[in-house]
A protein has these predicted regions:
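N-terminal membrane topogenic signal
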Residues: 1-10
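Alpha-helical transmembrane segments of polytopic integral membrane proteins
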Residues: 20, 24, 29, 68-72, ...
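Juxtamembrane non-transmembrane "cap" segments at the membrane-aqueous interface
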Residues: 30-35, 107-127
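Perimembrane loop-to-helix junctions flanking transmembrane segments
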Residues: 33-52
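Short, membrane-exposed interhelical loops at transmembrane-helix boundaries
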Residues: 43-44, 121-139
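Cytoplasmic juxtamembrane regions at transmembrane-helix boundaries
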Residues: 72-97, 161-177
Length: 177
């Protein structure tokens, strides 16, 4: 059963990440359609007959599930320190939620951070015909901060696993004495 839970968690991480990516890219599409229509869509070969929001969501899913794989591997592997299978399942799920929460929080912070109005350097990496370079850069910033938040969330998740393991171990010692 423990092996089944371990494998299920490894599968769950990229699935949850896909949902996160879909929602994340729907929100960033609202900020800058140009980021997708003039930049991201060129990197993916989705049918042009699809609605732009559907294509944006699919891009978010494709990018996020790939990020969910290493996060899931690390958090699930560290979760194996818990001897109890139920704790492995629930504590690892908590770390997944923590990771997605941190990624979301950092993305939200980035959405409200000022973008420099002198955007000449950033313009070099943009397509030429961008009408709203500030919104475009805001989406770039949100994406970058989301990844940083995910990494910080994963590190906090590792710490949470260790903290819960020590807490449970101390409780077991107290019970036995």
């Amino acid at each position: 059963m423990r092996t089944f839970i371990f494998i299920a968690l490894l599968i769950l991480a990229p699935v949850l990440a896909s949902f996160y990516g879909f929602i994340h890219d729907q929100m960033t599409f609202s900020i800058s359609e140009e980021f997708f229509t003039k930049f991201r869509f060129n990197n993916y070969e989705f049918p042009h007959s699809w609605h732009p929001r559907v294509r944006a969501g699919m891009i978010g899913m494709l990018n996020a599930w790939q990020t969910g794989i290493p996060f899931g591997i690390v958090l699930t592997a560290v979760g194996r320190i818990h001897r109890n299978t139920r704790k492995l399942l629930f504590y690892t799920f908590y770390t997944f939620v923590l990771t997605f929460t941190m990624a979301s929080l950092f993305s939200i912070i980035a959405a409200y951070m000022p973008i420099p109005t002198d955007i000449a350097i950033a313009r070099q990496s943009m397509p030429e015909d961008i009408l709203d370079p500030i919104a475009f850069q805001r989406v770039v910033q949100i994406n970058n901060f989301g990844y940083v938040g995910g990494i910080i969330g994963m590190l906090l998740g590792i710490g949470l696993h260790v903290l819960l393991y020590r807490r449970d171990k101390n409780k077991a010692i107290e019970k036995s004495t």
